[in-house]
Amino acid sequence: MTSETVIAPSLSTAQNDGTFTYDKVKSTAKERKHLNLKNPSDANEIKSKIWNYYSLSELIQYLGQKENDDFKYKRITLQFPDNLICDSATIVHELQRELNIVPQANQDTGESNTAQRVWILADTSYSACCVDEVAAEHVRSDLVVHFGDACLNEIDKLQAVFVLGKPTLDVDAIVKQIKTAYSTEQKVVLMSDAPHTYLLPEIAKQLPDYDILIADLPKTSRAKIIGYTPPPTGHKKFNRVFNTDTVEFGKYELFHITSPESPRLLQLTTNFASVTTYDPISGTVSTGPFPNLMRRYKYVHQARMAGTVGILVNTLSLANTKVLLNTIKEKIKEAGKKHYIFVVGKPNVAKLANFESVDIWCILGCDHQGIIIDQINEYYKPIVTPYELLLGLSDELSWTGKWVVDYKSVLEEYGNEVIQQNEDPDTDEDLPPVFDPVTGRYVSTSKPLRQINHLMVTSSEQGGVDDHDNQLVKRFSNAVAIKGTVSTSAIHLQNRHWTGLGSDYTEDENATGALVEDGRKGIARGYDI
C-alpha cells in the first residue's frame, strides 16, 4: 500500500451566483407622456405634476362642499381611461389626505352616514368618454368624477364632474401648420378633443389675419367641468359651442387637434368642406383617408330589406336613450319587422356572430367612441345608427347625405313620423315583390310581421294551434310559426344544414321539458333572493 491520501470524489458541482442565469422581471417605468416629466422617478415631481394637470385644488374644494353641516357628496366614484389609470393611486391618496377620508380597508364594517368614501371604477375601456353610470350604481354612488377626454353628452341620472386635464402643446408649431394649410381668405374652425380646448383661444390670437371660429366646450346641466369655464351662450353643434348665432359649416375648413375616433371623424367630414387633423405627439398633419359615407348609404338599403333587426345597446347613461330605444322598437314593429335587444358589453366580431338570425344591427352608443364604423367588413352583418335605420324604415327613402348621431335630433326628425301599413288582409298577396337593391335578389322575409293581426297559420291535420302544445316550432305547409306567429329565427334554424344535437332524428320529441323558475336577481355585490 502507498501512503498517498485518498480524496473522496465530488458528488456535486461547485455552484455560485455566476453559474446560472435567472430570468428577472424587468421593471418598466410608466412614461406618463401627458405630464411631461423631466425625471420620471422623482415622486415629488410626479405629485406636483398631477396636482397641476388635474387641478386637484379645485376638485378637492368641490368635493368638500357641505349642506346642513353634512357632506353633499358622500359616495364618490372615480372613472379613469386606460391611459390615465397610472395616476389613479396617487389621486386617491391625495383626495383621502386632503378630505380626511379613512381608507376603506381601515374602516369598520358598519357604514357611516357622515363619512365620505372613494372608489375607482373598473372596466370602462370601451366608450371611456361617457360617464359609466351602471358601474357607479354598483356602489350607489352619488357623484362620478370623470378623468380625461369626454364627449360631454347629457347624462341621464347621476351628477358628474369632468376633470379633463391640462395637456401642453407646441403652439408655434400649430400656428405654422395652419398658415401652411390655409390662406387668409378661407374660413377655418379650430376644434380639438376636450382636454386641449383650453389652448384654442391662445392659438387664435396668433392668427389675427385669419377668419377663425373656435369650437368651445358646452355647458351641461348635470355636470361641472373642473378647471374650465364654458361660455354661457352660443350656437351648439357637434357637442361644441360656437360664439355666433348661426354657422354654415359647409363653408368652413376644419383644423382638428388630435385624431378623433371613426364615428366622430365621419360626423365631421360630412359637415365641413375639408378636415385636417393634427397629431400633437408626432407634430404631423393628415387630410385622409377618412371613413366613407357611401358605404353608409348601402347599409341604409340593407336596413330596408332586413327582416330581423338586432338593437345593440352600448350605453345606458346618455339622456334620451330609453326614449330613442322605445321609438326604434315602435318603428320596427310598424314596418312589419322583428327585433331583439342585446346588451353585450364591449362588442366584437365573435359576440355578434353568435346571432345568425339577425339581418342587421342598430347600435345605440356615444357619437364619439360608442358607434362601430366597420371600414374593412370585419363584422358579418351590417351595423347602422338609429338615424340610418329610421331612414331605411321610412316610406320614401330620400337621403341628403347628412349623418345624424345626436339622439335629440333623431327624435325630432323621426319621432312623430308614422310608417304606413296596409291593414287589408285580402290585398297582401297583391303587393309588389320586394327586391334587394344591393344584390338584386328577391326578398320574401323583409316584413315577417306584416299584418300580424290577420296572420293565421292553420294545419289540415289539427285544424289550428293548440295553446297548450309545448312544442317550440311547428311546420305547417312550408311555414314556420311559434304559437301562431311567424318566427324568423325558426326559419333560419330550419334552413341550416345542421340544427344542433338530436336533429338527425325524424321522430318528434315528446318528452316534457324542464320548468322555468325565477332565479336570482340583482348584481354581484348583492343578489335579491
From Swiss-Prot:
InterPro entries assigned: DHP2, DPH1/DPH2, DPH1/DPH2_1, DPH1/DPH2_3
Record pathway: Protein modification; peptidyl-diphthamide biosynthesis
Residues bound to [4Fe-4S] cluster: C130, C151, C366
Pfam families on file: Diphthamide_syn
Cofactor: [4Fe-4S] cluster
Cofactor mode of binding and number, as noted: Binds 1 [4Fe-4S] cluster per subunit. The cluster facilitates the reduction of the catalytic iron-sulfur cluster in the DPH1 subunit.
Gene Ontology biological process terms in this record: protein histidyl modification to diphthamide
Cytoplasm in keyword set: yes
One Gene Ontology MF term: 2-(3-amino-3-carboxypropyl)histidine synthase activity
Keyword terms of this UniProt record: Cytoplasm, Iron, Iron-sulfur, Metal-binding
Cellular compartments per GO CC: 2-(3-amino-3-carboxypropyl)histidine synthase complex; cytoplasm
Source organism superkingdom: Eukaryota
Main subcellular location: cytoplasm
KW Signal (keyword) present: no
Compartments where found: Cytoplasm
Listed transmembrane segments: none
Functional summary from the UniProt entry: Required for the first step of diphthamide biosynthesis, a post-translational modification of histidine which occurs in elongation factor 2. DPH1 and DPH2 transfer a 3-amino-3-carboxypropyl (ACP) group from S-adenosyl-L-methionine (SAM) to a histidine residue, the reaction is assisted by a reduction system comprising DPH3 and a NADH-dependent reductase, predominantly CBR1. Facilitates the reduction of the catalytic iron-sulfur cluster found in the DPH1 subunit.
PANTHER family cross-referenced by the UniProt entry: 2-(3-AMINO-3-CARBOXYPROPYL)HISTIDINE SYNTHASE SUBUNIT 2 (PTHR10762:SF2), DIPHTHAMIDE BIOSYNTHESIS PROTEIN (PTHR10762)
Subunit structure as annotated in this protein's UniProt entry: Component of the 2-(3-amino-3-carboxypropyl)histidine synthase complex composed of DPH1, DPH2, DPH3 and a NADH-dependent reductase, predominantly CBR1.
Family classification: Belongs to the DPH1/DPH2 family. DPH2 subfamily.
Official protein name in the record: 2-(3-amino-3-carboxypropyl)histidine synthase subunit 2-1
